[in-house]
Amino acid sequence: MRCPKCQHNKSNVIDSRQAEDGNTIRRRRECDACHARFTTFERVEEVPLLVVKKDGTREQFSRDKIFNGISMSAQKRPVSSEDIENAITRIEKNIRRNHDGEVDSEVIGNLVMKELADLDEITYVRFASVYRSFKDVDEIEELLQEITKTVRAKKESKK
């Protein structure tokens, strides 16, 4: 590691510990030439995720797109930004664990739906109405019946 003071490229690690975020290592170093001390941070470089859209085009995975879609669906609902961020983190971890660099947009949509079903039923229905592009009221009614069964099952299991 190059010293920021004298540009010498040899240094010794004095201290090494995990940073607060848990994904970074903080290292205190001392330059072999001028003995200046400095801090470096090391983290894993994640492979960029590509989303394969329905028309076959590819674009980089965007947490912001998911956040905006969920936020619009969650307007005036008891869903915090933190709840949304946590859901997106779980979605991204799932994708990185189960897919190698590319994932279909449909998979992402289904993961979002799964998270929203657990988070807030109304937000789920709002998101589904856009995501699934319902063709008629019957399709919406089927979704509502499905959600009603799920909610009742959850309430029964809590008793």
UniProtKB/Swiss-Prot annotation:
Cofactor(s) listed in the protein's UniProt record: Zn(2+)
Domain (ATP-cone): residue spans on this chain: 49-139
UniProt key word rRNA-binding: no
Cited PROSITE patterns: ATP_CONE (PS51161)
Keywords, ordered alphabetically: ATP-binding, DNA-binding, Metal-binding, Nucleotide-binding, Repressor, Transcription, Transcription regulation, Zinc, Zinc-finger
Span list, region Disordered: 1-21
A Pfam family that the UniProt record links to this protein: Zn_ribbon_NrdR
Zn finger limits (unnamed): 3-34
Gene Ontology BP annotations: negative regulation of DNA-templated transcription
Cofactor note: Binds 1 zinc ion.
Domain of life: Bacteria
GO MF, one annotated term: DNA binding
Function comment: Negatively regulates transcription of bacterial ribonucleotide reductase nrd genes and operons by binding to NrdR-boxes.
PANTHER family: TRANSCRIPTIONAL REPRESSOR NRDR
Family of the protein in this entry: Belongs to the NrdR family.
Full protein name: Transcriptional repressor NrdR
Organism: Streptococcus thermophilus (strain ATCC BAA-491 / LMD-9)
UniProt gene name: nrdR
